[in-house]
């Protein structure tokens, strides 16, 4: 027998983290995802279940340099920078017992 709590009761809430970028993507549009989810009411939809929602806003990473792919990779240094930013933001929320979305 374990003393593990259900996940929902172990969490302090959820945190919305926007990463508005389409760097590295073959098609444009992914950068609009965070705004679209907010306009669609993701925070309200989650909070109606009694879950605390923290909107952390959008991360601010490097701009798209609009260059051709090199060896099959699009904007690799910028993609790495975005991933590091997102990693740090997710780690901070997990460290605060929050589920990052």
Where are each of the predicted segments found?
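Active-site pocket-lining segments that scaffold enzyme catalytic pockets across diverse folds
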Residues: 78-101
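N-terminal glycine-rich anion-binding loop in soluble enzyme alpha/beta folds
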Residues: 2-78
């Amino acid at each position: 027998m374990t003393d593990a709590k259900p996940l929902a009761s172990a969490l302090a809430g959820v945190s919305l983290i926007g990463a508005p970028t389409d760097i590295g993507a073959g098609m444009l549009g992914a950068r609009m995802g965070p705004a679209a989810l907010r306009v669609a009411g993701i925070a309200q939809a989650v909070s109606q279940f009694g879950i605390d929602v923290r909107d952390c806003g959008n991360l601010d990473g490097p701009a798209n340099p609009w260059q051709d792919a090199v060896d099959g990779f699009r904007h690799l240094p910028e993609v790495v920078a975005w991933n590091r930013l997102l990693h740090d933001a997710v780690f901070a929320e997990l460290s605060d017992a929050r589920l990052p979305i």
